[in-house]
From Swiss-Prot:
Source lineage: Bacteria, Pseudomonadati, Spirochaetota, Spirochaetia, Leptospirales
Transmembrane segments: none
Keyword Membrane in annotation: no
Name listed for the protein in its UniProt record: UDP-N-acetylmuramoylalanine--D-glutamate ligase
EC nos: 6.3.2.9
Species, as recorded: Leptospira interrogans serogroup Icterohaemorrhagiae serovar copenhageni (strain Fiocruz L1-130)
Source domain of life: Bacteria
Task of the protein: Cell wall formation. Catalyzes the addition of glutamate to the nucleotide precursor UDP-N-acetylmuramoyl-L-alanine (UMA).
Pathway: Cell wall biogenesis; peptidoglycan biosynthesis
Reaction(s) this enzyme catalyzes, per UniProt: UDP-N-acetyl-alpha-D-muramoyl-L-alanine + D-glutamate + ATP = UDP-N-acetyl-alpha-D-muramoyl-L-alanyl-D-glutamate + ADP + phosphate + H(+)
Family statement drawn from the similarity comment of this UniProt entry: Belongs to the MurCDEF family.
Amino acid sequence: MKFPESLKGLKILVLGGGISGNSALNFLISEKAQPILCDRNQPERTVVPFFPDNIPPQSLPEVSLVIKSPGILPTHPILSYAADKKIPVVSEIDLGRYFFKGKIIGITGTDGKSTTTSLIAHLLKESFPDLKEGGNLGIPFTSFCKESISLAVLELSSYQLEDSSPLHLDVSVFLNLASDHLERHKTMENYFQAKLKIADLSNSNHTLIVSEKIKERILNSISYQCKLLSFGKTSDSNAFLDENSLKIKTSKFVYDISKFYLPGTHNRENLAASILAAEEIGGKPESIQTRIPLFRGLPHRFQIAGEKLGISFINDSKSTNLHSMLAGMATWKNIDQTCLILGGRPKQEDLKPLYNFLIKGIGCVVLFGEARATWESGIKNIIGEKLYCVENLNDTFEIFKKGNIFPVPGLNKDIIIRLSDSISISSFVFSPACASFDQYKNFEERGNHFLSLVNDFLDQIDS
């Protein structure tokens, strides 16, 4: 929709609080609009009228616009009422986009969005020193959309995109697509179409960057006029990832990625996408190359949680689906001495890829949370006594504490933890492959709990 040039005096309903909704609320107040908040929970203090979100819609004050928070289901009665009354419904991203005057790179995909958003911003920091990153990652767009900055790098989730009008971004990145959020989108086609809303397909001045698989899908079924670029491991990709030479080749530069810090093919593919986006928006290749080795990743994403005497712990709490976990583990070494910690609230996913991974061999698996109800039987059929089932992460570390510590022959003071006669572990990888909401507010709280348990455990090991 086209926003009025001034929001002053307009009655606008913000449906859903949270980070996004509250940011939109504050922006509307700053623009002298007359916002109304409608949410499940009443805030302790608010300077605007509040209504519970289960109120009969006809009891709400008359408004000219609804701003929907991404967590609100499309079937909410207030949204149906707005549609009947022809009241426009927009997203917080729509609101920010209308008032922002700089260039925008948007990033979406099932996995890797946050890392890629942060990586693109990192690569462009010299070329665009005033840039800001945000959206679904960190800072809501409306909290800085009226600042005089040259570039915004935005992570955009499918929830945000399905609510948005055409965003007319300068560069869009669609990383990958795997089964996720089907409780919301119902089908993979709906999920794909929500993600694809990031693209300005009919605009020849727009650049859409996609994986090889998504490019093939677009070429086979979708009409487009935008500039379509791909990244991947085939030589005809616009950003060709050569795993043998550790180079990424574009039409403008050959990048040395041998000192790129993040492990795994999936992270190198994210880097290839990031390089293309950085080039397309105007980043200088020499500057991009200089910054590649300096990126250290984000917390809770295959982060080293602790190391001592050859024992290592990895915190990958951001892994909230099987696709993410399997991508991280694809190049993991010493798998037969690795304890994989899985669990939480599982999503509607095919478990065959998990079984195919485990059948190749694993040190052991600890399974916790709600996932035990649906995952235990299938995993046990494959790895038998190498599966431990517990209630929570605290119980997980009780298993580790009961293990016996043995020195590794010929390796100075290095040790291994023997959990049973047949299970000896040197690496503990926390990559849950499930949502956190059965026991935690979010994946960050879950990851921080894991980090604290790791610190306590390693403190008890004598040097």
